């Protein structure tokens, strides 16, 4: 995220922002129980670095009751930031369907949307695109050699940013079909779509597959916490020694 974008959108006083948690409440509690900040907490911390005069509401769109309360009031928000999750969108659970449905409601009312990792996958799906399991591997802690496209280099989000950069990242899935009229902003060897920009409804959406809001310290904590899943379920890493070398 570049200085021009920060100055335009995050340093204005009294902005009303809605921050959405991508994980289920149960998953969020698992994070908190082991001392790892939730994705929403990481987002709020990052935002406070740029601007302490923001009015931030936090929502978990997995909960139907939350959605009924907030949908009539969405127009009050200047922007939406939607964070990461351990969910896979093709699993099509009720919690995932609620998130997609709520994103569609946001497209009717909120003009600026920053959708990060899972958030981008929800936004893309809600706008008619498609997300599948990644075919070129996964990111476990870091995305290396993210390259801006020409369109990315002239987009406000990346103005004056290095054309090649690394970022914290943790994902197993990827966007395979973008929404109509989407502009491809960045890629790397793992994910063709590392970031994109598109418009739908009243919204402008910037979608990122990587995690600019998460510190490497938190990523290391997540990797250690997820080691059993990474080894036995995801089968992305052979053993604990390999995890230690990876870190």
Question: Where do the language-model regions lie?
Answer:
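N-terminal beta1-alpha1 cap of cysteine-dependent amidohydrolase-like domains
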Residues: 1-109, 233-247
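Pocket-forming structural segment of enzyme catalytic cores
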Residues: 22, 129-217
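C-terminal helical/coil "lid" or tail adjacent to the Rossmann-like core of SAM-dependent
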Residues: 212-247
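Short, glycine/charged-enriched secondary-structure capping and boundary segments
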Residues: 32-34, 94-97, 127-131, 182-183, ...
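Short loop/helix-cap segments at secondary-structure boundaries that form the rim of catalytic
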Residues: 71-75, 122-125, 176-179, 197-198
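Short glycine-/acidic-enriched loop or helix-start segments at secondary-structure transitions
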Residues: 29, 91-92, 124-126, 179, ...
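Cysteine-nucleophile active-site neighborhood
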Residues: 77, 85-151
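Hydrophobic/aromatic beta-strand patches that form the interior of the parallel beta-sheet core
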Residues: 18, 57-59, 81, 114, ...
């Amino acid at each position: 995220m570049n200085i021009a974008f920060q100055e335009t959108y995050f340093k204005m006083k009294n902005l009303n922002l809605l921050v959405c948690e991508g994980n289920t409440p149960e998953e969020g509690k698992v994070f908190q129980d082991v001392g790892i900040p939730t994705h929403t907490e990481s987002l709020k911390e990052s935002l406070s670095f740029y601007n302490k005069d923001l009015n931030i509401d936090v929502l978990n769109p997995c909960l139907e009751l939350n959605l009924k309360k907030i949908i009539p009031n969405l127009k009050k928000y200047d922007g939406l930031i939607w964070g990461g999750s351990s969910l896979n969108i093709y699993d099509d659970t009720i919690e995932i369907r609620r998130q997609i449905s709520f994103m569609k409601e946001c497209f009717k009312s909120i003009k600026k949307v920053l959708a990060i990792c899972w958030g981008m996958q929800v936004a893309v799906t809600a706008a008619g695109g498609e997300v599948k399991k990644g075919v070129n591997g996964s990111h476990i802690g870091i995305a290396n050699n993210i390259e801006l496209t020409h369109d990315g280099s002239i987009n406000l989000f990346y103005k004056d940013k290095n054309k090649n950069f690394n970022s914290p990242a943790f994902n197993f899935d990827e966007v395979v079909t973008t929404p109509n009229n989407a502009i491809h902003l960045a890629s790397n060897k793992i994910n063709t779509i590392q970031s994109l920009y598109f418009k739908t409804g009243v919204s402008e959406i910037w979608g990122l597959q990587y995690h600019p809001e998460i510190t490497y310290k938190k990523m290391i904590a997540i990797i250690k916490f997820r080691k059993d899943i990474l080894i036995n379920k995801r089968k992305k890493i052979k053993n604990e020694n390999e995890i230690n070398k990876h870190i």
